[in-house]
Amino acid sequence: MSRAHGSPRSFFPVGNPFRVMFPGGAHLSRKLQELLASYEDALALSLRKLKPEAASDVLTLSWMRLAVDCLSELHTNIANLITDLELPVSDWDDKWVDIYLNSSVKLLDICIALSSELSRLDQGQLLLQYALHVLGSESGVPSQEQLKRAEPSLREWMELVGVRCPRLVSCSATLQELAGNLSLMKVKNSVKGKVLMRALYGIESVTVFVCSIFVAVLSGSPKPLVELHVPEKFGWSQAFNDLHTAVSEELTRQLAGGSVAAVKELEEVEACAKRLHVLASTSQLEEEAANLANAVSHTEEEVMSDSIVQEGDHHCGLKLADDTTRECEVVISESIAEEGTHEAEMKKDISYEKGVAMVERISYEEHQDSNVKQANGSSDESALVVPERTSVQESKEELLNCISSMSKSAEGLRHGLDSLSKRVGDFFQIVLTGRDALLCNLRISDAASKVAEVSS
């Protein structure tokens, strides 16, 4: 029946694109056209939002949060579309139900794996917070004892982030399976069914690709990335293919080295933790060297002091012996008065001169030993203390800067992980709610069918 003259123009000014999308004579009503166009426009807009200015931004927690928000919005939209289509579950083909239930349960498994990994990384924050708490000091510079207490926590945290999560490794095979099963199912005798399958193909393609990015980034491996190319007949194909090309090339390049910690916020904290570990070890070695030098200097002083005391005792002994000899000579000279007073006085003068000479010699030697001690002490101080003080001061400044950087990076990582974990949990609930709603409607439909059979 031909269209009457003056009737309204077509909704599409350059022809109906859905004739290409739905070959075989399937015609969409204006309502269905508007529903599908609105859904696919929103899908294309979300994909354009996900395309970062720099491809490396997909390695950040902030981009991952944006991606989960987009997925949540798209899955909410598909639920609304199913409602607006007014397509009861009783009219669904068994294959449609199987596709939806199979893909949704695998998607839930992936969400659980992602949540588990984020939770594991978040628990590691306790180790970082403890280490930073131990390193905190009113004077600013942590002591050697504080460094020793913090070192095991830093080492344990680095070991934790260096381990690949087994659940994420298993997700790679699941994602590849989902990507391999993606196809636009042929639907006969149901225009609404064709719209539904087209919408499901779009959301599954985007979900699988985004989830593969998450798994690749968190596992530090490009293997989970799926290879997809959406045909041009889909209105959102250009946005999807542009995002896929940019992100896949960048991730493959970034993850080629096999680094486990691929998230930028995580890498920043790890770099600070490694540097802090090195500085703590260096500071410990420097302090041990300084203590050893001080011990050697103290030992030398004690040995020198003991030597001087022993030499002084020896000289005093000589002096005492000489005085005793002199007294004996005086007694003998006095007892032999018959030999002459002049000879006795000569002996007395000679003995006195010997005593004076001995005292002068001892005084001179002690003065020389004192000069040697002062010279050695000054040389040791200039050789050990001054250079060490400069080296230790530089190490302490670098240590404080590293602690400050790690504190800021750890705080950013904590907020990022908490926010992303919450969003992944919300997305899990959206998928689970949609799946439960379908199962509930199936049970109601089956019950109604059985009642109808009994009634008939």
Curated annotation (Swiss-Prot):
Alphabetical UniProt keywords: Membrane, Transmembrane, Transmembrane helix
Annotated compartments: Membrane
Membrane topology: Single-pass membrane protein
InterPro entries in the record: ROH1-like (IPR008511)
Transmembrane annotation, as ranges: 205-221
Highest taxon of source: Eukaryota
Family: Belongs to the ROH1 family.
A GO CC annotation given for this chain: membrane
Main location: membrane
Protein name per its UniProtKB record: UPF0496 protein 4
